Every structure is written in structure tokens, then in C-alpha cells.
């Protein structure tokens, strides 16, 4: 806000905060009379009217053409979010329920699906979680099983709980000794390494391998490198899209909601929104045009990263109309992300 005495500035911010709170709660444009009645602003309605005129001139609030009241602009929401000092914490009972629900997930996929369902319920918006990015995970174990003497099953297990199985046709028969040697070589090259490093190590194996294993290793390493470097981080879990249609009017112009829903279908768009916020413990709020996605101009996105012991596995967050309960949404996103991290760390 412009240069003015801090007490005037603070009071004006209180007026803006009151307008945001009332508009989010009621969907009704707010007039100065209502503000004075509902909020203990400690000044006359003439002062509030004057403050509102300044807020409007500075672009923080605007007058919808059919009403005498005012509603926040994206700039107004931004100012509000930047100055949120207290985020509404979830109650102890809510936090306990969230943790229990996540802990009963049977595996990584289930925990993430549960996280999305929870976020959508808590915020009454669309929730989205990105599967752990491959680059962040490590190989926990590689298992080699002979299905028959010329056919192997390779099983790669990562620390994020992902299991990949691939069958390799060898074109020749391997005996038990060769199989043991193959297991040892692959284990030494891959176990405990980040996927990119494991893939590089496997690609080099055929050159240094004993002669009788070379052909087998060329086939095995080709399949493994493909497995390790493919990109399942393109996978997203979405929940609560019905919440958007319930709030269709909040998306402003007719057709805006359809644009938002179409943008959500584009995984690349959503991944870009999530990728920008990968600090665990910090929540990023992008309002309207700040999303830098043309179709999302009428929406806000609240995102964070989730992960285990300081390393980020993926992004998650909530998408809804710019008229959203920011303090509540920020708290929900932060809490669910934190607990997903805790649950995954215990696995």
C-alpha cells in the first residue's frame, strides 16, 4: 500500500481484511455500513468509507457493476495473503484424525490417494498430489528371478515404495553360477544409489563384465536403464473436482470454470504449478494471473512440497476460486503435507 502513516496503513489493512473475510464467508459484496456493524474497526463509517475509496483507487477492491458493495481484487487477496499473521491451526482432534486416516494407507499410492481425499474434504476445493519424482528416489533393492533358463524377471524396489518389474528375454541360457554373478554385479551397481546414478552404473556394466556375461548384461542393462529413467513423475492424483462445479459462480465470467477444468486435464499445466513450490514446510499461494496459466486467471493455487527428512518427494496442493478461505486452506495444505511426510518416513 502507498506511503502513509503506519497506523493509517494498518487500519486500512484491517478494512481490507474485513472485506476479504466477509466476502469469502458470504459471497456478497460488502458496503461500509455492514463493515462497521460487523467488525470492531474502532472508527466512524465515514472513515471506513474514505478507507474503502483509497483501497479502490489503489486497486485492492473493486465494485461489481450490479452492486453498491465492494469485493477484493486479486491484488487485494495478494496483500491479504502476504500479511496473514496467524494461519488458522487445525484442532488437535482434526490433526489426530488426519494422521490416523493416512497411517492406515497400505502403501505409497494409498497414502497419497488418502491425502488427496482429505485435502479436498478439508478445503472443499480440488486437491492434487504429484507422485514422488523419480530423480529423488534411491534403489533399495534389485532382485533377479529366473522364470526359465533363458528368461529373467527383474524387480527394482525404490525407497519411495515403488516396485517395477520387467521381463528380459536373454536369447541364450544362463546357469545358476552366472545368475549369482549377475545378481552380485547388479546389486553392487545399483543398491543405495539415486536412480540416475544407478542407471549410469548399469549402462557401464557390459564393458567391464566377464566375457560369458557380456551378452546377457547388454540385454539386462538396456531394460533396466529404460526402467530407471522413464518418468512416472508425470503421474498425478486429483480429488474433489466436484467441489469446483459446486462453486461455479465463484469463477467469475461464464466459461471460466470450464477453462479451469480443461487446464486441470492437462497434466503438464498442473505439474508446472506444483513444480514451482517444492520447499517442504513453506506454502506458496498464487492468485489469479500469478499462476501464469491463461485458463487459471479466475483461480488460486495453494501448494507445498511433501517429503521425508528434508528431501522433497513431490508437490501437492489445492486449487479453487480466488474467493477462497486462504488461512484455512494454507493450514490444511501444510498439515496434510507434513503428515504424509511423517507417514512415509515410518515405512
From Swiss-Prot:
Which Pfam families does the protein's record reference? Answer: HrcA
List the Gene Ontology MF annotations in alphabetical order.
DNA binding
One of the GO biological process terms: negative regulation of DNA-templated transcription
InterPro entries cross-referenced by the UniProt entry: GAF-like_dom_sf, HrcA, HrcA_C, WH-like_DNA-bd_sf, WH_DNA-bd_sf, WHTH_transcript_rep_HrcA_IDD
Q: Which UniProt keywords apply?
A: Repressor, Stress response, Transcription, Transcription regulation
Q: Which residues form the signal peptide?
A: none
Q: Name the domain of life.
A: Bacteria
Family membership noted in the UniProt record? Belongs to the HrcA family.
Q: What is this protein called?
A: Heat-inducible transcription repressor HrcA
Q: What species was this sequence derived from?
A: Nocardia farcinica (strain IFM 10152)
